[in-house]
Amino acid sequence: MKLVLARIDDRLIHGQVTVGWGRKLRPQHIVLASDEVAADAWQSRVYAMTVPPEVKVMVLTVDEAASVLQRPADHGLAGRRVLVLTGTAGDMNRLVESGAPVTAVNVGGMHFARGKRELLPDVYMDRDDLEALRTLGGRGVAVTVQSVPG
């Protein structure tokens, strides 16, 4: 497995991911790690339908995603280009904490919500988000902010 991007984006799969990052990185699989989305069959199907037909989507809980990423050959990902998405910094931190082989994280859209403050355009965080990113950095994970590829 080649992990082409691990991204935090509260919109999960959308145009910037499928068109912007997808065209540049050409993922063959997207692993969407979200306990909330994985528990909702309708949301899972909708996200899976929003990608080009040649891209396979796996909607998993954070723990399931960590397990899959630790043993990619057991899940049909050997030799495949994989993009990982979480909706929150906390979920990405849990993914890494659970053993997912993530060495770099891209922060995409983290939009306004009550209690969050703007750090950059389209990037709003609260203390929990900042702490999760600090923890990732402390684990040696490189953290960058970039909406679309340059």
Give the residues covered by each predicted segment:
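Structural motif
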Residues: 2-6, 28-31, 55-58, 80-84, ...
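A general structural motif
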Residues: 9-12, 61, 125
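Generic hydrophobic/aromatic pocket-lining and core-packing "Φ" positions
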Residues: 18-19, 92, 133
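Short gly/pro/ser/thr-enriched loop/turn and capping motifs at secondary-structure boundaries
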Residues: 38-40, 65-67, 92, 112-115
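Glycine-rich, aromatic-bearing surface loops/beta-hairpins
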Residues: 89, 98, 103-150
